[in-house]
Curated annotation (Swiss-Prot):
UniProt-recorded name of the protein: Dipeptidase 1
Residue numbers binding Zn(2+) 2: 141, 214, 235
Species of the source: Ovis aries
Subunit structure: Homodimer; disulfide-linked.
Coiled-coil annotated spans: none
Record lineage: Eukaryota, Metazoa, Chordata, Craniata, Vertebrata
One of the Pfam families matching this protein, by short name: Peptidase_M19
């Protein structure tokens, strides 16, 4: 009965190697499309976006989760790079900052043309696959980047933006963020305001993917019900496995299934295990769970590399994707399901968004009501019958009191 027991560890190693070998084989023909990577933000923080600084060389930069050798080792074939600007830029220089981050992404493609190919559509991703390059797309992380302007939304589209996260971790004047669900922020729009609905419709018209990572549950529900095209969660996980409000609850996963939408699983420990520590197997648990609830077509990868401080053991950087794919194969995912999670699910969603677009339709023109905007530096141009500067709440009352007092003194 115990004959050859000493061979068991060797058999286990061989089996593990076989899963990884199969993962590599699959990824050579179907590389990863990752939904969210914050390398551009890391380049701003470390080098003030100066890519020609020798220290910023992406072939040798080792202080980030992402560099060119790691991307190649991880079989990353397409990346939505995050054009991110923090919430404290809202009502200030968010548009300027966003354009600068888009510029960084485009300069990455110019500086490393042998590695990166900047693309703006699903066909471009497939072209990059054929050329053995990393298709590089722009995802703008946070609705504050459009400064409540459909004109800015369109301008960012023309600069290459192909998804917009409706909020980051702050409300916009037209959409609520996930902190509303924790009680840390107050709901302003009950999901989406009338202008927020106009943003969603204009994104549909243009062919911009709607990203619901970071939004409140009410905003998830409103956008999923309103959008004519599938949406994505570019870097979120399953709420049932980790009760963090950045994750997606089961009833929303059902809406994801009904609409053909996509959840690209985040690797941040706090969203994976709800603890400071996590491991690769727990990330696979989230992938398993979303597949069970929403279907194999609803699963993707959104690692959030270079945007988080803690990553699971076994997924320390972008080179580790083959190990995660090997774990899915070990869990008896079919090759078809794995190819879907790697790339085909995102390509399906992207193509559906493109097909739903209608550039012949008249663009949205209704501006957000001036009273819904904040910050005293806004001018009145285009808004009739208003002061030359948009006054903060209470300022109008103060002005009326001053006027009445002056009349009494006459």
């Amino acid at each position: 009965m115990w004959t050859g027991w000493w061979l068991w560890p060797l058999v286990a190693v061989c089996t593990a190697d076989q899963f990884r070998d199969n993962a590599v084989r699959l990824m050579q023909s179907t590389p990863v499309i990752d939904g969210h990577n914050d390398l551009p933000w890391a380049l701003l923080k470390k080098f003030n976006n100066q890519l020609q600084d020798p220290r910023a060389n992406l072939t040798s930069l080792n202080s980030t989760h992402t560099n060119i050798p790691k991307l190649k080792a991880g079989f990353v074939g397409a990346q939505f790079w995050s054009a991110y600007t923090p919430c404290d830029t809202q009502n200030k220089d968010s548009v300027k900052r966003t354009v600068e981050q888009i510029d960084v992404i485009q300069r990455m493609c110019q500086l490393y043309p042998e590695t990166f190919l900047c693309v703006t559509d699903s066909a471009g991703i497939q072209q990059a696959f054929q050329e053995g390059k990393v298709a590089s797309l722009v995802g703008v992380e946070g609705g504050h980047s459009i400064d409540s302007s459909l004109g800015v939304l369109r301008a960012l589209y023309h600069l290459g933006m192909r998804y917009l996260t409706l909020t980051h971790s702050c409300n916009t004047p037209w959409a609520d963020n996930w902190l509303v669900d924790t009680g840390e922020d107050k709901a302003q729009s009950q999901g989406l305001s009338s202008f927020g609905q106009s943003v969603v419709k204009e994104m549909n018209r243009l062919g911009i993917i709607i990203d619901l990572a970071h939004v409140s549950v009410a905003t998830m529900e409103a956008a999923l019900q309103l959008s004519k095209a599938p949406v994505i969660f570019s870097h979120s996980s399953a709420y049932s496995l980790c009760h963090h409000r950045r994750n997606v609850p089961d009833h929303v996963l059902q809406l994801v299934k009904q609409t053909g939408s996509l959840v690209m699983v985040n690797f941040y420990n706090d969203y994976v295990s709800c603890k400071a520590e996590a491991n690769l197997s727990q990330v696979a648990d989230h992938l398993d769970y979303i597949k069970k609830v929403a279907g194999a077509g609803a699963v993707g990868f959104g690692g959030d590399y270079d945007g988080v401080s803690r990553l699971p053991s076994g997924l320390e950087d972008v080179s580790k994707y083959p190990d995660l794919v090997a774990e899915l194969l070990r869990r008896q995912w079919t090759e078809e399901e794995v190819r879907g999670a790697l790339a085909e699910n995102l390509l399906r969603v992207f193509k559906a968004v493109e097909q739903a677009s209608d550039h012949k339709q008249a663009p949205g023109e209704e501006p957000i009501p001036l009273g819904q905007l904040e910050a005293s530096c806004r001018t009145k141009y285009g808004y009739s019958g208003t002061p030359s500067l948009h006054l903060q709440p209470g300022s109008l009352l103060a002005s009326l009191v001053t006027l009445l007092l002056s009349l009494c003194l006459l």
